[in-house]
């Protein structure tokens, strides 16, 4: 079975991907990871992607589709997987339907203010990279890592103004995609503002549901 996870940054889809992957032996396929893997292995596509990224451009649909299709074909037959970060637009969605027509689409719904609170509160240790949150996972000493005692910092792209820009771009990019899947009654919406266990239960129900 194939699952497609759609949702803005901070919606929890990355966390849920790890949980489903570990508990149900699904393979987590991220386009970002595939790009890095191809660049690291210096494949023909990887070399092309590296040049594109170094120019500050977006990787074209044809390359993204090719990399995802190759990865899915390379997976052992009947292996379950989660697609994270693909498709991102109608062109990619139509291509996915051609080589993999029966995936389940799960859309993580969450209020923008909650996303901003979640991500703007994130703090990362400079020494050990452990992640904390000033709202949901506080440290004993303000600004100090509980694990190694290192200093905590806030990533530039976790600052409120940057987050608002990222969320605006996400909405513009995915709105046509959401409409595309809604029209053919394939979209499964999940409330991502609740606790992780509740989200997991809802996704398991979707996984068990017949197409």
Curated annotation (Swiss-Prot):
Subunit field text: Monomer.
Disulfide bonds: none
A GO-annotated cellular component: cytoplasm
Binding site for ATP: 10-15, 122, 131-132, 194
UniProt protein name: Adenylate kinase
Amino-acid positions noted as binding Zn(2+) in the UniProt annotation, renumbered to this chain: 125, 128, 145, 148
GO terms of molecular function: adenylate kinase activity; ATP binding; zinc ion binding
Enzyme kind, highest EC tier: transferase
The EC number(s) this enzyme carries: 2.7.4.3
């Amino acid at each position: 079975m194939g699952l497609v996870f759609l949702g803005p940054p901070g919606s929890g889809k990355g966390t849920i991907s790890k949980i489903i992957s570990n508990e149900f032996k699904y393979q987590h396929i991220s386009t970002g990871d595939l790009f890095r893997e191809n660049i690291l292995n210096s494949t023909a596509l990887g070399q092309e992607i590296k040049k594109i990224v170094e120019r500050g451009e977006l990787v074209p649909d044809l390359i993204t589709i090719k990399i995802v299709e190759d990865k899915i074909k390379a997976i052992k037959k009947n292996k379950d997987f989660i697609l994270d970060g693909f498709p991102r637009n109608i062109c990619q969605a139509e291509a996915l339907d051609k080589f993999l027509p029966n995936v389940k689409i799960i859309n993580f719904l969450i209020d923008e203010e909650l996303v901003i609170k979640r991500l703007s509160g994130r703090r990362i240790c400079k020494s050990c990279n452990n992640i904390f949150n000033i709202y949901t996972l506080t440290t004993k000493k303000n600004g100090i890592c509980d694990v190694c005692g290192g200093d905590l910092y806030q990533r530039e792209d976790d600052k409120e103004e940057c987050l608002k820009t990222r969320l605006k771009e996400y909405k513009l990019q995915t709105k046509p995609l959401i409409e595309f899947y809604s029209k053919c009654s394939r979209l499964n919406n999940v409330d991502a503002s609740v606790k992780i266990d509740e989200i997991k239960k809802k996704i398991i129900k979707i996984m068990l549901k017949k197409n």
